[in-house]
Amino acid sequence: MQTFAEIAALREQIKQFKRDGRTVAFVPTMGNLHEGHLTLVKKARELADIVVVSIFVNPMQFDRADDLNNYPRTLEADLNKLTGEGVELVFTPTPEVMYPDGLDKQTFVEVPGISHMLEGASRPGHFRGVSTIVTKLFNIVQPDFACFGEKDFQQLAVIRQMTTDLALDIEVVGVATVREMDGLAMSSRNSNLTIDERQRAPVLARTMRWISSAIRGGRDDYASVIEDATDQLRAADLQPDEIFICDVKTLQAITSESTQAVILMSAFLGKTRLIDNQVLDLVSETKEEVKEETAE
């Protein structure tokens, strides 16, 4: 496994692989790797001849200085894990390499609409930071495939839209969320939880499943469902951040035409922000029967 901290050297090695006719799959990360990240790496291995992983804690996408400063950094352990997965190339740039003139003078990429709704409304600039760094990394690595976790649902939607809008010749591949045995979605931030917080953390996933069951059971009073879910989180001493129930394709309010919904949730445990999501079908057997009767 080769590790690069500079752009030019990484580019040259990738060009050599491509001259040899090899395909490249890319997994961008912020480090503190867990089994969820390694699942992305395994998927990348299935897709291409060469796997490139980046480890970069991107300051542009953080809206709170304390969150940036507290983000776990475990480079040595990360490199050991990637070696075990047989990764060919790892890119570990510094902020000075990625933003040589500083953030204030950095050209940015921003996907209109979707970047400013839902999570983007409460975290201004977050998705701009994501779009900018992913565009730069795509430009550096020039992958055939790029793998992202579906846990960051809106982020994945932003990246897919950006890739389409900019006509990038890259296949963006979403990979299902990997969970702990108790249902908690794996996240680098989980390592910041205290023992007590870690015991309470699965409440987020349980509440999400409750929302899903309520909707499948026929509840379409979504505002009321969200209120009930908020109460459940508070009862477990989680601080609700955001809960959205929206159309899976548009991320807008559910309409009579919606066939699938996505539940997007976030909550704080102490200083740690946890996120999760679940996609569910809205077309019930009753609705299907009505459609069949109408067709007759």
UniProtKB/Swiss-Prot annotation:
Other comments on record: The reaction proceeds by a bi uni uni bi ping pong mechanism.
Protein name: Pantothenate synthetase
Active-site residues, as the UniProt record annotates them: 37
Organism: Vibrio atlanticus (strain LGP32)
Annotated catalysed reactions: (R)-pantoate + beta-alanine + ATP = (R)-pantothenate + AMP + diphosphate + H(+)
Transmembrane segments: none
Pathway: Cofactor biosynthesis; (R)-pantothenate biosynthesis; (R)-pantothenate from (R)-pantoate and beta-alanine: step 1/1
Residues bound to ATP: 30-37, 149-152, 178, 186-189
Any single Gene Ontology cellular-component annotation: cytosol
